[in-house]
A protein has these predicted regions:
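Hydrophobic, proline/glycine-rich low-complexity stretches
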Residues: 1-6
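Conserved donor-binding loop and adjoining core beta-sheet/short helix segment
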Residues: 9-79, 191-214
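Amphipathic coiled-coil/heptad-repeat helices and related helical stalk/stem segments
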Residues: 55, 121, 172-173
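Short acidic (Asp/Glu) patches
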Residues: 58-59, 86-91
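Short, glycine/charge-rich beta-strand/loop segments that flank catalytic centers
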Residues: 69-87, 98-102
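Acyltransferase donor/substrate-recognition loop-hinge adjacent to the catalytic core
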Residues: 90-163
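Short, conserved active-site entrance elements at the starts or edges of catalytic domains
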Residues: 143, 147-195
Length: 214
């Protein structure tokens, strides 16, 4: 079971969201087990690593841990389903979790915005350039962190800081910014009249993929 292409598998993702989602982990038969609690729902991610032959023992340990309660597993890769079905009971239900699918784009498509599919995005970008001819786009450096955090705080306040989901996202975002160098992540920002108006944070995932966290 070594099909780890999802954004939830990055250390950065697990680290910055650990408080909001009460993320904890354990090792069982060389498998990494990640437990998450979100909106009072507790679930585990697909077990990572280990030898396929040991997965049934891991499932049995999970059953004991959940003390007879149903186990909800998320972040399952399509390639893993046949193996999981062999380890689980016939009453186990599998369902698509489309709301949590990752969006996957080719770099060249986003860089060029060619074709009808990206027409609206290209128009939006062109309108922004026309309205803000003096905007400055640059990579985020440590000198920009304070300004980015201030902008994130303002964004949360404008969106409704009392909403739990926004407070959670702000907490994760500030974790990423405050640990920018240690996490080895990268980012870019836009300033208009010297003031940060937008930024993004991501990291290289493997040889042919990057993950955009925010």
């Amino acid at each position: 079971m070594r099909y780890y292409q999802g954004s939830e598998c990055t250390f950065t993702n697990l680290f910055v969201w650990r408080r909001c989602y009460r993320i904890c982990w354990a090792i069982s038969h060389e498998f990494l087990i990640i437990k998450v609690t979100r909106n009072d729902i507790t679930f585990v991610l697909q077990p990572f690593g280990g030898d396929d032959k040991d997965l049934p023992a891991v499932i049995e340990e999970l059953k004991k841990t959940f003390a007879g309660k149903s186990i909800e597993m998320r972040g399952i890769y399509e390639e893993s389903i046949p193996l999981l079905k062999r380890c689980l009971t016939e009453t186990t239900q599998f369902a698509e979790d489309r709301d949590n699918w990752d969006y996957v784009y080719l770099r060249d498509n986003l860089a060029n915005l060619a074709g009808r599919k990206y027409h609206a995005k290209k128009n939006h970008a062109n309108a922004f350039r026309k309205e803000n001819p003096d905007y400055v786009f640059s990579a985020i450096s440590e000198a920009d962190i304070t300004d980015c955090i201030a902008f994130a705080d303002l964004w949360c306040e404008m969106k409704g800081q009392n909403e739990e989901g926004l407070r959670c996202e702000l907490c994760a975002l500030e974790e990423a910014l405050n640990n920018f160098k240690n996490l080895n992540i990268r980012g870019a920002l836009i300033r208009i009249n010297g003031i940060v108006q937008a930024f993004t944070i991501g990291e290289k995932y493997n040889d042919d993929m990057a993950v955009i966290h925010f």
